[in-house]
A protein has these predicted regions:
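Short alpha-helical
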Residues: 3, 40, 61-62, 89, ...
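Proline-centered helix-kink/hinge sites
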Residues: 4-6, 104-105, 123, 150
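Conserved Class I SAM-dependent methyltransferase catalytic core
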Residues: 131-197
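Conserved SAM/SAH cofactor-binding pocket of Class I
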Residues: 10-116
Length: 210
């Protein structure tokens, strides 16, 4: 799996801020971690928001096994629904979430170091973002508008050079229904893209279960 990096903490902080701002309206939010890998983001979100119903998906069975072990070690295994899925493909139709976090492969294929780089110890699947680093995110944005509940928030991690193009893709995907912004990390580099849907409504509308 991809080794968790400090930059990814920003995704958790942004998701928590958005959810806490709506805590009265949505006291038991549904959260989806797409491409969960080791489960780090889902676990922290579950720990920080005990009332939340957290789902975590990954295309890799091996990654989900690691995520399950980590969730058990942190005492939240029973509160995270782990599912093998290519993005949202295996999620029940109509299930929506109040927050979606995604740290998907975003390294341009040509920039992947063959060796001996630390990335060589991580599966290529967890790094390869296609020719421009945005291939997987394009697929995510094709389905996300149908997965966010009213007022929901999508938080995505990107490489600084692709943050602006990814933000543009998000604006196009939501057809101006969402406020999209780029948030820098502690080093001042453009790192996270946040898409905030307008409107209010039932959390996780038309969804059942965790």
């Amino acid at each position: 799996v991809l080794v968790p990096r400090p930059e990814s903490e920003l995704l958790v902080e942004l998701a928590l801020a958005a959810l806490r701002a709506r805590s009265r309206e949505v006291p038991e939010p549904r959260i989806l971690d797409v491409g969960t890998g080791s489960g780090a983001l889902a676990i922290v979100l579950a720990l920080e928001m005990p009332a939340a119903r957290v789902s975590a998906v990954d295309v890799s069975s091996a990654a989900l096994e690691i995520a399950a072990r980590n969730a058990r070690a942190h005492g939240v295994f029973g509160r995270i629904a782990l599912l093998r899925s290519d993005l949202d493909a295996e999620l029940p139709p109509g299930r929506r979430f109040d927050a979606i976090v995604a740290n998907l492969p975003y390294v341009p294929r040509g920039a992947l170091a063959p060796s001996p780089d630390p990335t060589s110890f991580e599966p290529r699947l967890a790094l390869d973002g296609g020719p421009d680093g945005l291939a997987v995110y394009r697929r995510l944005l094709a389905c996300t508008p149908d997965r966010l509940a009213a007022g929901g928030t999508l938080v995505m991690e990107a490489a600084p050079p692709t943050a602006a193009p990814l933000a543009a893709l998000a604006r196009a995907a939501f057809a101006e229904a969402a406020e999209v912004r780029i948030v820098p990390d502690l080093a001042g580099l453009e790192r996270a893209i946040v898409a905030q849907l307008g409107g209010t409504g039932t959390p996780g509308a038309n969804a059942n279960g965790p």
